């Protein structure tokens, strides 16, 4: 329902501005408490977002936009994917695409690192997977900032003692910051046994995404306790987007050892 409301609102924005043909994209901010939607940006042109949408769906937005601008209609153009349906058919996909922004605040020391609706990223990474965990972890690695997935991060003020109140306050303080690596602190909070409900109350993240991160952390814990000789577990880890390097870190062994075990069990990348 929320998606349909956005779709209809996007068309209304295009008509109001006067975009009759070509590529365009509209971006919204959504209040998670009441569903209120606000238009924060509209690009009446083929943009970087259009390029990512093309990669994600296989629909050649720039090419179609150019042909429309010279007088063709969508019904006259062939769908490049199916080869027999017109381009007016909206693309449907059976996989998950994740886009994550790339921030380099370390290069811009005078810039406020607090995130808002103002664009502060210098680029983004996109990944495709058969499920969210796989797509998400692949996207994190694609940022090329040294992550193997939901890597552990240190939390200032947290100690390994049983000072529960002090540790809770330290975790809560980091979660309250709207910062680029907030997702890693959320994962760390889950590792420290903070509930999804508590994290949602602090961050306002949708519980679905928090539950997906919870599943990744649960798999981490299962991997730490079990042997990699268990083929079903290793296969589950790979299907959930864990790289050989990430598994090696969990088991405190070399990446080469993980790769050898994986190949021994005939677990190899496949393409649909």
Residue ranges of each PLM-predicted region?
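ATP-dependent carboxylate activation and anion-phosphoryl transfer catalytic cores
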Residues: 1-233, 240-241, 265, 269
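C-terminal amphipathic alpha-helical interaction region
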Residues: 233, 245-272
């Amino acid at each position: 329902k929320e998606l349909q409301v956005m779709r209809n609102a996007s068309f209304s924005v295009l008509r109001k501005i006067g975009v009759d043909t070509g590529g365009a994209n509209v971006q919204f901010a959504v209040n998670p408490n009441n569903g209120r939607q606000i238009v924060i940006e509209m690009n009446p042109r083929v943009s970087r977002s259009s390029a990512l949408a093309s990669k994600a769906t296989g629909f050649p937005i720039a090419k179609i936009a150019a042909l429309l601008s010279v007088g063709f209609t969508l019904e006259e153009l062939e769908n490049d994917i199916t080869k027999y349906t017109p381009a007016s058919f909206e693309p449907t996909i059976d996989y998950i695409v994740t886009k994550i922004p790339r921030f380099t605040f370390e290069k811009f020391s005078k810039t406020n690192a607090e995130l808002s609706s103002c664009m502060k990223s210098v680029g983004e990474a996109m990944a495709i997977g058969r499920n969210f965990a796989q797509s998400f972890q692949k996207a994190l690695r694609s940022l090329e900032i040294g992550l193997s997935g939901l890597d552990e991060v240190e939390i200032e003020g947290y100690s390994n003692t049983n000072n529960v109140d002090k540790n809770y306050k330290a975790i809560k303080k980091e979660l309250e910051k709207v910062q680029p690596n907030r997702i890693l602190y959320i994962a760390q909070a889950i590792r420290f046994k903070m509930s999804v409900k508590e994290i949602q109350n602090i961050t306002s993240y949708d519980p679905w995404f928090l539950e997906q991160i919870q599943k990744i952390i649960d798999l981490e814990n299962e991997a730490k306790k079990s042997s990699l000789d268990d083929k079903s577990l290793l296969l589950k880890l790979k299907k959930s987007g864990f790289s050989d390097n990430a598994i090696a870190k969990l088991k405190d062994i070399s990446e080469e050892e993980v790769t050898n075990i994986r190949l021994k069990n005939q677990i190899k990348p496949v393409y649909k």
